[in-house]
Amino acid sequence: MKVSWRNKIALPALLIGIILMGFSSPVVCEDASTGAMVELNKSDRDALALLGGRVVGKALPAFPIRDTAELMPLREGKWAYRITAGERTGTRQETAISKTKGNHGQDLWHRTIVGDFTEFISLDGKGAINLISEIDLEQNVITRYTPMLPIMFDGMKTGDSSQVETVVKVYALHDPTHLKYKGQLKVTHTYLGAYEITVPAGKYETVLIRSSYVGKVGPAHVVDGGYTFYARGVGIVASVERMHVTAFLFYDKRTKTPKVLIQRGGS
């Protein structure tokens, strides 16, 4: 994938308004006093091997998810990752999280993979975190989701799956009234368990979420998945995933981006 390292993107007021349309209800959470240790099956271990042989460690007691705001903290800062496989092996990938301005009092943020794409995220005050839309900086398109895609589900127990069906609309970035592609995605998130993860930034206790995507967007038939490890107070410490939905449309469908945290931000 060709990457041009641009650090900023200017978004006019009209574009911000379109991006921030369409919000959904919060997800309620609850707690428990015991947690099960779950060993990964072979197919999951094989998929995670792209991270490197010593990244995924022992299973830990896995409790119900009750603090998504801590597992994916939304605070301003910069995080750095190292890509561990593929054409960009060894490349440093920088991520910046910033508060979104002009949001009429709503708690909205944007997360930018520098030079690649920007995600717009909502936080409802009760821990529910949702993906509203994203901008592909290479292809100059905006992708919007109706309803929004939950990134984390409070209350999930080990082995639980949550499924969301969403309408996907892809617009031209510089003419957000021009609909280029439309389709539907069924997104399933499964809480696999808790695991010790060792990355260049340190050793962390994490929860592992497996995601799967099935559907059709424009000419692209989507059957794919990914894995993300979250650590409390840090966010994503390792992942094997396709970085954004428009990758299905414009890039090699087999390409995923495994990465590990090398520098944490937002402290």
Model-derived regions, located:
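Bacterial Sec-dependent signal peptides at the C-terminal "C-region" and cleavage site
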Residues: M21-D31
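Bacterial N-terminal signal peptides
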Residues: P12-G22
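Bacterial N-terminal signal peptides that target proteins for export
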Residues: K2-A13
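Solvent-exposed, flexible loop/coil residues
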Residues: W5, G155, L208
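Contiguous hydrophobic, core-forming segments of folded domains
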Residues: N103-V170
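Intrinsic disorder/low-complexity segments
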Residues: M1, L20-G22, D252-K256
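Acidic, serine/threonine-rich low-complexity disordered tracts
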Residues: C29-L123, Y171-S267
